Structure formats: C-alpha cells, structure tokens
C-alpha cells in the first residue's frame, strides 16, 4: 500500500493518486464538542510540505465519496483511507463521543447511509492509547444505526509509537480482535531507527500477535524506502508516491513486492 501523506485538500486527492498512491492519509481536527471539523494538520509538519492546506471535514469526505464510488476513474486506484484523528485537542472523556460523531458523519457523507456510497476501506488512526473508547463509540453507533456491515470496511491504528505490548493490551480492552494496522515513524525532517517497526513486524508474524499490517512514515528518500521494504512492511506512507513506485520496480523488490489492488483485503495478514 502506497499511502499518500497529509492529503487534506480536495485537489490533493487527484494529485497523490496520479503519482501512484492507492491509499491516502488525511488529518482530522475536532471542535470543542468532539465533532470532526476540518481536514487540517497545521504547523509544524513535514519538511518541504505546505502545512496549512485544509477543507471542512464534510466537504472533503463528500469529495472522497465521489472519488471512491464505482464509475469514477479513481475508483479502482484509491481504496484505503487513513484518518489521522487529532484527538489531542479533546479531553479524554470525549473520546467515545468523538467516535460516535465521526461514525454518524461518515455514515451520512461518505457511506451515503449505506446506499451506494464510497467504497474505500477506512483506518481510524488514534494518537493516544487512552482514547480507545473512540473505537467502541464508533462501532456502537454504526451498529445502532443498523449498519454493522460497514464495520467490515473499518480498521484501527494507534499512532503514538507506544510499546507494542501496551497497544495489544488496549485492543483487548476495546474488544478489537482484527483489522489492526500498526504504524511507526517520525516526520521526514528527522531520522528514526527500525527497532520498533521490527517489533511490530514480529508481532504481525507471530501466532498470537494482534497486528495484521504494518506501515512506516514518512518515507521520502530512495534509500529509506529500500530500508523500509527490507523490514518487510505492508505499507509506506510518503510525500512522494512516485519514488516508492520507482523503488518497487527495482530488481531487488519487483519480484518480492507488488502494489496492492482493490481486490486485496487490508485486514488479512500476508503469509509468504
């Protein structure tokens, strides 16, 4: 999965897909009442990027729905969306409410109330383990609205670079048993080692691990891309999807990896 990083403006959806992204990551900021408000990152952000691009959340999600509905030219090119949920502005007790409001919003504006809406898989990426009730609030809301089947298209990620064992315990608390992606990484302005990504891959590949897929961010340089592929990840989050595509076509990688398609299930652990 080639995950276009910080796609917060409607025009950027096309831009990143045209460069080779089959997935995008979008930042979601919340208002004081825990409503998803903007697709916005703000400063500071990755080196070489404009941190201030934004849309109203509802507008972005409607445009995303159009792009990921059968009949659109991007439909079979873009099929995974990571919502990077900026819950740091919320009190811990608001996490469940944020999940409820996000679910209602996506049900209406993205899934079109289950009536031929957007078809992409969605990952809820949460920066704080304490906010695990966002997941339960989200799940209970979709079930309560009579759309439990839409949870088949929803996965989860904790993005705070916490200890993998702690992450697994929180999933147990939240009752999550699958659809788990694990991110690791740091802004492209800094270097980060592979110790934790290796631990995440080991959990993914162990019999009793909870992780299904692992991705690393933000991978922009050619050598870092090679090192990341050598760590056996499933996804690369990048500001330059075309560089990821270029490296995947190198002799060392083109027989070992392939770019994911709409037919690939992002919740299935890949077994060699």
Curated annotation (Swiss-Prot):
GO terms under cellular component: extracellular region
Catalysed conversion reaction: an N-(acyl)-sphingosylphosphocholine = an N-(acyl)-sphingosyl-1,3-cyclic phosphate + choline; an N-(acyl)-sphingosylphosphoethanolamine = an N-(acyl)-sphingosyl-1,3-cyclic phosphate + ethanolamine; a 1-acyl-sn-glycero-3-phosphocholine = a 1-acyl-sn-glycero-2,3-cyclic phosphate + choline; a 1-acyl-sn-glycero-3-phosphoethanolamine = a 1-acyl-sn-glycero-2,3-cyclic phosphate + ethanolamine
Cofactor: Mg(2+)
Keywords: Cytolysis, Dermonecrotic toxin, Disulfide bond, Hemolysis, Lipid degradation, Lipid metabolism, Lyase, Magnesium, Metal-binding, Secreted, Toxin
Gene Ontology biological-process entries: killing of cells of another organism; lipid catabolic process
Residues forming the catalytic site: 5, 41
Family that this chain belongs to: Belongs to the arthropod phospholipase D family. Class II subfamily.
Protein name as annotated: Dermonecrotic toxin LvSicTox-alphaIC1bv
Organism: Loxosceles variegata (Recluse spider)
């Amino acid at each position: 999965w080639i995950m276009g990083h910080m796609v917060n403006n409607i025009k950027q959806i096309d831009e990143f897909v045209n460069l080779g992204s089959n997935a995008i990551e979008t930042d979601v900021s919340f208002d004081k009442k825990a409503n998803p408000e903007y697709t916005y990152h703000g400063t500071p952000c990755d080196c070489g990027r404009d941190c201030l691009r934004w849309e109203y959340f509802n507008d972005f999600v409607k445009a995303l729905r159009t792009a990921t509905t059968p009949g659109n030219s991007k439909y079979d090119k873009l099929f995974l969306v990571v919502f990077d949920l900026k819950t740091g502005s919320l009190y811990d007790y608001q996490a469940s409410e944020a999940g409820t409001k996000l679910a209602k919003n996506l049900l209406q504006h993205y899934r079109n109330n289950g009536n031929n809406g957007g078809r992409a898989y969605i990952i809820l990426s949460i920066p704080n383990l304490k906010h695990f009730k966002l997941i339960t609030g989200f799940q209970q809301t979709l079930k309560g609205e009579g759309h439990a089947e839409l949870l088949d298209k929803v996965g989860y990620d904790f993005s705070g670079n916490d200890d993998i064992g702690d992450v697994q315990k929180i999933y147990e608390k939240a009752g999550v048993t699958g659809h788990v992606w694990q991110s690791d990484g740091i802004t492209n302005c800094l270097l980060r080692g592979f110790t934790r990504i290796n631990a995440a891959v080991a959990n993914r590949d162990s019999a009793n691990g909870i992780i299904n897929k692992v991705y690393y961010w933000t991978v922009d340089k050619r050598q870092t891309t090679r090192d990341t592929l050598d760590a056996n990840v499933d996804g690369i989050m990048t500001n330059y999807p075309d560089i990821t595509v270029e490296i995947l076509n190198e002799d060392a990688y083109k027989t070992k990896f392939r770019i994911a398609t709409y037919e690939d299930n992002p919740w299935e652990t890949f077994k060699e």
